[in-house]
Amino acid sequence: MDFQIIALDIDGTLTDDRKKISSLTLETLIEAEKKGIRLVLASARPAPGLFSIRDQLKMEQFGGILMSYNGGRITDCEGNTFYEISMDLATTRRILRFLEKLPVTVIVDDGKMFYVTDKNGYKVEYECRNNQMQCTEGDNLADWLTFSPIKLLLAVDPMKIYEVQEQIRNFLPEDLTVVRTAAFYLEIFPRRINKGQGLCDICRILKIDVRNSIAFGDSENDIPMLKAAGIGIAMKNAEMDVKKASDMSTLSNNEDGIPYALRALNVI
């Protein structure tokens, strides 16, 4: 098959457990770009959290695409936005007041800055460092927020995450969803946002048949993308539901699973 796009989840997929891209994975993906295959970084992260990886992969040189916020915002590597979908501000405020009752740390961003009620909250420093963004603190997010966010990020004790997710799911209006994006993260965003729709939209923009795409992922939020792609590939370290939704599995993110699969498919 003539593959023209490789869509890549970041954490637990493209990067290893140290948040690094291995030299073999880097070399293989740049080799794919030199063959004319476009890379798509498909992440729950805000766009600034993708910039370092974009630069390592030389994506600007080869026309790569950034899919941030699980597909809530799609841009080219120069920062030009193809589209963006955000939450309603009044609804967001109601949700924030509800979340005050739950054991979660809420992190909101506008693409440039994180907004929290406690800079020392669970995973706040980790998230700021990982995305290379600054953080500002205030007393009450529900009253303080003045913009419509694309998503709400919730850091949760992994032992409580399924229980908390169910409580939130029962509260949310029909047009919003809550998804696990890591063992300790939940994200709330518009239901029409998902990586699968994002991949389809990118293919439409680039005039590429989505069947000519490969996608790699490991988490629940990757499932729509793995189903939408011509070939969806789950990492060995993926959740079982992700593996069931994929066409095939590969080695883990610590074992160069991406190069292994691309060579098995004769892409490289």
Description of each model-found segment:
Residues 2-18:
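Asp-based phosphoryl-transfer active-site loop
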Residues 23-123:
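Active-site phosphate-binding/coordination module
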Residues 25, 50-54, 164, 168, ...:
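Hydrophobic packing residues within well-ordered alpha-helices of enzyme cores
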Residues 36-40, 62-64, 151, 211-212, ...:
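Short active-site oxyanion
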Residues 46, 70, 111-112, 184, ...:
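A generic "binding-loop/recognition-motif" signal
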Residues 57, 62, 70, 171-174, ...:
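Short, structured coil segments at secondary-structure junctions
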Residues 98, 102-216, 237:
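Conserved acidic, metal-coordinating active-site core of Asp-based
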